[in-house]
């Protein structure tokens, strides 16, 4: 596990051939074994039998890329949170009970969860907008497992899943997007309306753990205002989790760091190829609209934009405390400044890694930071200062 958490996932690598607004994508295939009820209705002996059957297939077959199986009962809560921050397990897996585990490939582009929402959930993660490559990787594992396990399948409905929203293909494709131009030009809702007609849902991202009240602590000194005090969330809320069904999403106006999730709504009545086709078309349109919005923003509000970028870079390069939400917003302006040619010397791969490593569990595991909110905020600020050392504003 130490080797896993110290290795940077391949899906974080910057893609020179992919538009910057499209950061990463994943494809999930949910499957259930015909002999058992859904995991939440299983007793522990049944969950254990499902896990044993899956692990025996791993041992006796070579259809999976190199990796390891991790039993949840062998991991502490901090390690589980670290995996959730890496998008290798979902929030449902983090909160589930009973025997369960996850197989993770060494490059962390593939994870197979056992006994989360469904008996098996195959998760493939790719950089940029490689949605078809993500599906192809997941589909190869699905085909191999389907030959060895009797998956629940209905001739008319397709694959049967714990959630009705997954019945059919059992496939969810989601893409992480960075859309500051559309946000600042107030064009996001027009985009959302068009996407909903294509049966695609655009949502904001949520910082934190829904089980914990995320009221930030404002440690402002008397006489300070206008953003001169850090806003630091509780320690367990300094994270970004993902879930299977979109329950960890926010309204567009409430998102953090100009980040958004695009996901297919339909799993019934469309084939996998049709879902991928619609998603790819939408991503091309989104990238074009975002680039147009950035050009328009620079043309119409250039001085204001450059002032905001300068303020963000000054804060990110000097602050001694950074909350998670604040850090994501600063990272958005850093990314925007670099892609629009307003700063030099930035390593975009380092910025991508920072978005992973600045989360609470990663700071504790990788840097030994104490699990107190201010300690995490202090270390996060140090990471940003280190990132920006050697950079310059044009």
Regions found by a protein language model. Give the residues of each.
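Long, Pro/Ser/Thr-rich low-complexity/intrinsically disordered regulatory tracts in eukaryotic proteins
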Residues: 1-156, 163-164, 171, 183-185, ...
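Short glycine-/aliphatic-rich beta-strand segments at the starts of folded cytosolic domains
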Residues: 173-179
């Amino acid at each position: 596990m130490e080797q896993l958490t110290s290795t940077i996932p391949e899906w974080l690598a910057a893609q020179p051939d992919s538009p910057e607004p499209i950061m990463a994508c994943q494809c999930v295939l949910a499957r259930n074994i015909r002999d058992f009820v859904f995991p939440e209705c299983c007793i522990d002996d049944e969950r254990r039998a499902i896990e044993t059957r899956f692990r025996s297939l791993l041992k006796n077959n070579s259809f999976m890329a190199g990796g390891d199986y991790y039993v949840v009962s062998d991991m502490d809560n901090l390690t589980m949170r670290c995996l959730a921050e890496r998008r290798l397990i979902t929030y449902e897996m983090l909160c589930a009970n009973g025997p369960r585990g996850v197989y993770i490939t060494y490059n962390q582009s593939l994870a197979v969860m056992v006994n989360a929402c469904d008996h098996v959930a195959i998760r493939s993660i790719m950089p940029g907008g490689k949605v078809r490559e993500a599906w192809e990787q997941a589909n190869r594992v699905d085909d191999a497992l389907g030959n060895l396990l009797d998956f629940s399948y209905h001739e008319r409905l397709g694959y049967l899943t714990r959630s009705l929203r997954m019945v059919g293909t059992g496939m969810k494709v989601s893409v992480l997007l960075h859309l500051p131009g559309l946000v600042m030009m107030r064009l996001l809702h027009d985009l959302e309306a068009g996407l909903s007609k294509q049966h695609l849902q655009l949502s904001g991202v949520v910082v934190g753990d829904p089980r914990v009240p995320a009221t930030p602590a404002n440690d402002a000194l008397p006489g300070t205002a206008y953003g001169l005090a850090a806003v630091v969330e509780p320690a367990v809320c300094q994270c970004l989790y993902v879930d299977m069904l979109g329950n960890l999403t926010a309204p567009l106006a409430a998102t953090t760091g100009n980040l958004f999730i695009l996901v297919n709504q339909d799993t019934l009545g469309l084939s996998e190829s049709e879902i991928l086709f619609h998603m790819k078309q939408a991503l091309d349109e989104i990238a074009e609209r975002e680039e147009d919005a950035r050009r328009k923003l620079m043309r119409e509000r250039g001085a204001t934009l450059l002032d905001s970028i300068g303020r963000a870079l000054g804060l990110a390069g000097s602050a001694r405390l950074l909350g998670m939400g604040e850090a994501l917003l600063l990272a958005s302006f850093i990314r925007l400044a670099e892609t629009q040619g307003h700063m030099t010397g930035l390593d975009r791969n380092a910025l991508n890694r920072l978005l992973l490593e600045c989360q609470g569990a990663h700071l504790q595991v990788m840097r030994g930071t104490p699990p107190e909110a201010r300690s995490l905020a202090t270390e996060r600020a140090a990471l940003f200062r280190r990132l920006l050392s050697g950079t310059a504003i044009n």
